[in-house]
Amino acid sequence: MEVARDGIMHPVDDFLMVVKAAMLEMMMMGKMAERYYYYVQLAFKMLVGVLKNLPVVYSYRYDAREYITETSNAVLGDDEVFEFGSSGEMVNSFLAFLRRALDWCAKFDEPPDMGGHGIEFMYPTRPTRIQRSTMGYFVRPKVPAAIVADAAVAAANLHFSNQVGEVSVRVPSRDLQPGEAGPSSSGGGRRDPAQANRGPVARVTPFVVERRYEEGEPGENGDESDEDGGRMDGDEDAAQSEQNNDDGMDYESDVTDHSSAWGEEPDRRHDAEAGERGSERSGSNSEADERRRSYENDDIQVDVTSVSEDSESDGDFEERRDARIRGATADAPRPRRGEREEDDERGEGAANDGGRRPARRDSPDSVIVIDDTSSSEDETFPPVLWLQRRDDPRTLLSRTRRAASRTRTIGGTRPRSRSPHRRGEGRDLPEDN
């Protein structure tokens, strides 16, 4: 409850301070006595007397003093006679009286034209802020010394007197922090009791954002950088692709078909097993592991449209096909081939091993070129240049998937749902007897 700067309080606030002081003492003592009931009821009677005896009390519709008397008698009721059969009956009677009194006082918070009590006081008062049907009084507990020092919490005593007597309310408050300005009444940086209702100061820790540069400062060597200062993935792929093209790598010798052209994740198990067998035969696990890691980390997608050889000459067809291949794979990094694989293709590895193992060939045995001469719009798959090994199990897998996809659209049929619970298929419905 705040006190007006000029010291003038609303008469209702005077009554509420007595109620809070009595409730606080009951909570501290852990019990209720008849004297608390008597003090609160006496304070309410004094409030009614003050309101009726004000120099100027104005009402728009009726006599304000007569209206106050009638409504206050309804609040008091028959509780003036303190004859209770038990302590529980006394507590229930006190709570009922307190609820009626608070409802009666809450109407003074409303403006007269909104229906309050229709009464205006012709002197400046501070408005009352209370709840309508209940009263909640919360005391902030003292913070243990293990969490914060006792010097961080100070207590301020608010004293005032009324017709009932002297009222003192102890309000916990916070000490002034170092470097915080404010009036001091008792020295030692303690807060003035009149300003004890001031809330704690919010402490905000600045969040420092550090920019990290993996490849150097932004703009170095003409590379574009993202927000974090690192190089963009697209720039790294383009740089790797340009470096591979400069090295003169043969496309047909190191690009194999993947199921990624069908919109699916490629299966790396066959390549991992082939890399492990090659590392065991070569006796060098480090080179095989390095090649396998570089191959697994790269996602190669090929989408090349071939044309008919009948419409063009052989030279023009080869040049345009190579140009399309380079353009389609310009932004995809390619794995580097080890020297051991090149020796195996030429047969030098088998000669050096003394005939212990046959020569290993990683280049495709055949090149399958799909010639798109059809103008049908029902074609569901674009023409793709297939570069595969005959012993590669992915060859059979990809061809099977393509054949199944083509036959699925014949006759406008849709694939049958695998789940028997969709659209009521496969359900055993009870027979009607």
From Swiss-Prot:
Residues 265-280, 354-364, 422-433 have a biased composition (Basic and acidic residues). Keywords: Host membrane, Membrane, Transmembrane, Transmembrane helix. Residues 169-433 are annotated as: Disordered. The chain crosses the membrane at residues 36-58. It is a single-pass membrane protein. It is found in: Host membrane. It comes from the Viruses. One of its GO terms (cellular component) is membrane. Disulfide bonds: none annotated. Its main location: host cell. Residues 216-227, 234-254 have a biased composition (Acidic residues). This is Uncharacterized protein UL-1. It comes from Psittacid herpesvirus 1 (isolate Amazon parrot/-/97-0001/1997). The lineage of its organism: Viruses, Duplodnaviria, Heunggongvirae, Peploviricota, Herviviricetes. The gene is UL-1.
